[in-house]
Swiss-Prot record:
Keyword rRNA processing set for record: no
Keyword Glycoprotein applies: no
GO CC terms in record: cytosol; small ribosomal subunit
Keywords: Ribonucleoprotein, Ribosomal protein, RNA-binding, rRNA-binding
TM segment ranges: none
UniProt cross-references to InterPro entries, sorted A to Z: Ribosomal_bS20 (IPR002583), Ribosomal_bS20_sf (IPR036510)
Cystine pairs: none
PANTHER family according to UniProt: 30S RIBOSOMAL PROTEIN S20, SMALL RIBOSOMAL SUBUNIT PROTEIN BS20C
Listed name of the protein: Small ribosomal subunit protein bS20
Family label: Belongs to the bacterial ribosomal protein bS20 family.
HAMAP family registered for this protein in UniProt: Ribosomal_bS20
């Protein structure tokens, strides 16, 4: 346990950020899971909406500093690729 006042504050900040980051990551995973479920049903319209929602979630994670922009680009590229397979 830290003894210095600034170190104590940093621990508190880290805990708060960890909680926030976990929440944002969870939102991204949930959006991607919903998209994958829509793909499994092969419903193009629902999948398109879910894809948009997943992309928004990924972009928000980048804005908040939770995901690196290249990791986000890779995720979005893979999601789009899978959509294009069923859209054919």
């Amino acid at each position: 346990m830290p003894n210095i006042k600034s170190a104590i504050k940093r621990v508190e900040i880290t805990k708060a950020r960890t909680i926030r980051n976990a929440s944002i990551k969870s939102a991204v995973k949930t959006a991607i899971r919903r998209y994958e479920e829509a793909l499994a049903k092969a419903d193009k319209e629902v999948a398109e909406t879910a894809l948009r929602n997943a992309m928004v979630a990924v972009d928000k994670a980048v804005t908040k500093g939770v995901l690196h922009k290249n990791a986000a680009a890779r995720k979005k590229s893979r999601l789009t690729k899978r959509f294009n397979k069923i859209a054919g």
